[in-house]
Amino acid sequence: MPKTETYPRLLADIGGTNARFGLEVAPRQIECVEVLRCEDFESLSDAVRFYLSKCKESLKLHPIYGSFAVATPIMGDFVQMTNNHWTFSIETTRQCLNLKKLLVINDFVAQAYAISAMQENDLAQIGGIKCEINAPKAILGPGTGLGVSTLIQNSDGSLKVLPGEGGHVSFAPFDDLEILVWQYARSKFNHVSAERFLSGSGLVLIYEALSKRKGLEKVAKLSKAELTPQIISERALNGDYPICRLTLDTFCSMLGTLAADVALTLGARGGVYLCGGIIPRFIDYFKTSPFRARFETKGRMGAFLASIPVHVVMKKTPGLDGAGIALENYLLHDRI
């Protein structure tokens, strides 16, 4: 089939809260981007059909190729989302949507593919020197959950992406304050993973733990209705609520620890890339937050980490971009 006949391609980036859809009408050209709330639809197929009906006027041809990035491990045909109610069969969904091929990949595999094609203005660098060519790149990011993957670019330019579930590693507190936060979480959960703190709901959990800290009983606190990640972040930045600022500082410190752990584990001299929608909302604060200092606080390996740049991904739809690149790679090489 001529390459032009594979367009438009149906792309999706499906997280725990939102599903983003787009149509790739030409290489790296994505149109008709829509964001739908997962809770508004009984199933993935229902959401896709609704999306396609909204884009009906833009569709000259029905898509026959699709690529969906989903926030869950892919272990066969049956897919169960980690942080929402959707479950689906890849093959049944392909047939239901009249697609010739439906590629389904982990969302942070898509993020890794997207990073392979990013320009300098798509990224905000936080410390470090420069990336080492062909060295592993670590990709992680807090959102509804916490995703982790690895990107390796070989000397011939080919890409290898290693998916993982690093967000579910056990969290290790760094200091007495984080021990207090961990103990609060441990009273609620049998397993306290990094994702428990480094996610949208994690901001709320950190706030709740800190609000019970001795000496903070009389500090101004949020009402129950205000206890959301967005409001905690806003109050932290405007300076009205010191406990919110402490919450955000603690969040960034914890993220620095995890990012350093991942970088050391992978030998990520190619850089660390932070994805997701949370950090770009407060990027100016993040540049001077405790993140970078904590990232480099690794004893004998501090100098090793000091040279590694951390990049915050500022691009709006990297998940869709990566889903498109993964599909292109599949169609060219019949592999990803």
Swiss-Prot record:
Its main location: cytoplasm. It is an enzyme of class 2 (transferase). The keyword Phosphoprotein does not apply. It catalyses: D-glucose + ATP = D-glucose 6-phosphate + ADP + H(+). Its EC number is 2.7.1.2. It is found in: Cytoplasm. It holds the Pfam family Glucokinase. GO terms for biological process: glycolytic process. Coiled coil: none annotated. InterPro entries: ATPase_NBD, Bacterial_glucokinase, Glucokinase. Gene3D superfamilies: 3.30.420.40, 3.40.367.20. It comes from the Bacteria. The keyword Kinase applies. Belongs to the bacterial glucokinase family. This is Glucokinase. It comes from Helicobacter pylori (strain J99 / ATCC 700824) (Campylobacter pylori J99). The gene is glk.
